[in-house]
Each structure stands twice: as structure tokens, then as C-alpha cells.
Amino acid sequence: FRQVMQTTVFTLASAKALTQSRRLIDTQVQLKEFLPALRKSSWISLDTEADSLHSYPEKLCLLQISLPDTDVLIDPLSQIDMTALFKALASRELLIHGSDNDLRLMYAAQQFVPSKIFDTMWAARLLGFTAFGLNDLLSKLLGITLDKGSQKANWTRRPLTDKMANYALNDSRHLRALTDQLRDQLKSKGRTTWHEQICNKLIRDHAAPKETDTGQAWRLKGSSKLS
């Protein structure tokens, strides 16, 4: 595999001198101003954050979107109407890492189902990577090490700290470069079709979510042997 030997600790703040207020979209006006750039963008990568560690059921707390020239955070907790946003996303290929949770959150929030995704985690698994977390892949393939200090943060917190904002944006902004490398490797190994089939199944599964069987949800393998 092609690797970059020099590892760099990367934070968004050191790469782009943006204040949080400029990269956080939490009003209808800001969202409307952002949509033209989204619609004409040559690619779109995204990630989400939820409050699963602090409440149940979990809900979508943050949507991170990266385009060639910008990275933004969109705040669903601000009660903005995201209908136009998801309509714009629906017809595009979305670059996502480990899309299962993201797709579930976006469906629950807006009944959103994308038409096409490229899941970098599943690409790595098909290529035989034994460590396929985002940080693992970025380090191995791009020489980038991310600060994961906000991994267990409370994403309902407002305002977001700079550390939280940087953590969130870093999860989406490198996905295009990672996708390019993984897509090339899938093609060279003849596994592109397999990956497309997996991504399509992920989309189908979230387009028709199954009702939760509350009894089944609490059954554990071997639980009948407990006393």
C-alpha cells in the first residue's frame, strides 16, 4: 500500500483560520447561503455526532459536511429546517466512514435515504485492513494522526468548544483523500463491485428500517442459562 512516511498531528484550526461562528451553521439564513456551494460541489463527505452516551434514544446533534473548499458544522439542535439540505444531499454520492450509524441517525431525523454512498470503512475491510478505524486508515495511508480527545464528548452542549468543533470537522474533511486511495485499491484488486453491493445494501437497509422488537432487544445469547 502507498504510504506517507512522515506522520503529522493535524488539527483543523492550524490548517484553516476559521472562527467557530463562521463554520457553524445554526440559522436558516446561513443554511440557505451554504446550499448553492453544496449543490455545485464536485464531491461531498460527511459525518454525524449523536448524544448516545448521554441520553436514550440517541438523536442527531451535529452534521459535519466537507466540500473541496470548505468544511462546515450544521446544528440540528438549533431547530433549523433541514429539508432543503437533505434534498440536495439525496442525489449525490456521499463519502462516509462507517455509515451505518450516520444513515440511521439521518433517517430518524429526516427520513433521509441517500442514493449513493462510498463507505471508507467497508472499502478497507474488503481490502484486508485489520485496523479499519478512521484514525488507523488516515495514519496508514495519509500520514495524518487526529486528536480524538472529544470522542466521548456531550454533543448536546452549546456552544461547542473549539476542541469539539475541530474534532468533528476532522472526521469529514479527510474522507475525499482517503476515498481516492481506497477506490484505486478496490479497482486494482477487482473488488469495486463487491463494495458497491455492500454500500447499496446499507442504503436499502436504512430505507426500510425494521420495527424494534422490545422483547428481542433484551435477549442475550445464552441468557436462558442464567439464574
Language-model-derived ranges and their functions:
Residues V4-I44, T48:
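N-terminal accessory regions of nucleic-acid-interacting proteins
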Residues T48-A50, T120:
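Ser/Thr-centric signal marking residues that sit
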Residues A50, R158-P159, L220-K225:
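Active-site flanking loop/helix segments enriched in acidic
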